[in-house]
Design a protein with these regions (language model features):
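A glycine- and Lys/Arg-enriched "phosphate-lid" helix/loop adjacent to the NTP-binding pocket
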Residues: 92-136
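Walker A/P-loop
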Residues: 14
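Glycine-rich phosphate-binding loop used to anchor ATP phosphates in small-molecule kinases
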Residues: 54-95, 150
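Conserved substrate/cofactor phosphate-moiety recognition/catalytic segment
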Residues: 22-60
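NTP-dependent small-molecule kinase module
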Residues: 19, 23, 69, 133-169
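ATP-binding Walker
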Residues: 11
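P-loop (Walker A) phosphate-binding loop of NTP-binding proteins
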Residues: 8
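Hydrophobic anchor at the beta1->P-loop junction of P-loop NTPases
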Residues: 5
């Protein structure tokens, strides 16, 4: 059983994924973390040197490796759904949970984080609105379940996912 978590930046994918993996005794992976591990540099550095296009290519390569594994929980980067190939990989190899997160929550959570290349030196609210408009339907398209994260802690969201997995597989 593979569990894939998608959603915008600031939705809590990594936090929730770690809890779900622990509860279900599965291995946890994070696409961004795996990219940093393999390259030895930060996502921010990759964006600066290779641009978003270079990062997306790396992301797809890492995703191919990770979806080939079994019994994992995978927290994906917010933009992973942009590429058709990535959506196909996710949909064909596991159960996909979309963490639907209101814009105001995303803004609050990302305001303190300086490691968000897409928000660097930009109006964060405007960027997040544009990203939501461009990606929300892609998250919905690829997901098996949509989890509303509004006013919920990471552990509350994780409990919902664990319950769904235990009840419906």
């Amino acid at each position: 059983m593979n569990i894939f978590i998608v959603g915008p930046m600031g939705s809590g994918k990594t936090t929730v994924g770690k809890i779900v993996a622990s509860e279900l005794f599965l291995d946890f992976y994070d696409t961004d973390g795996t990219i940093e591990e393999k390259t030895g540099v930060t996502i921010d550095w990759i964006f600066d040197i290779e641009g978003e296009g270079g990062f997306r290519k790396r992301e797809t390569l890492v995703l191919k490796d990770l979806v080939a594994l079994n019994s994992i929980v995978l927290a994906t980067g917010g933009g992973i759904v942009i590429e058709d190939e990535n959506r196909e990989l996710l949909a064909s190899r596991g159960t996909v949970f979309y963490l639907h997160t209101p814009l105001n929550t995303q803004i609050e959570r990302t305001a303190k984080d300086k490691d968000r290349p897409l928000l660097k030196n930009k109006n964060a609210s405007e960027v997040l609105i544009n990203l939501q408009n461009a990606r929300q339907f892609l998250y919905e398209e690829v997901s098996d379940y949509i989890i509303d994260t509004e006013n919920k802690s990471g552990s509350e969201v994780a409990k919902e996912i664990v319950k769904l997995v235990k009840n419906y597989g």
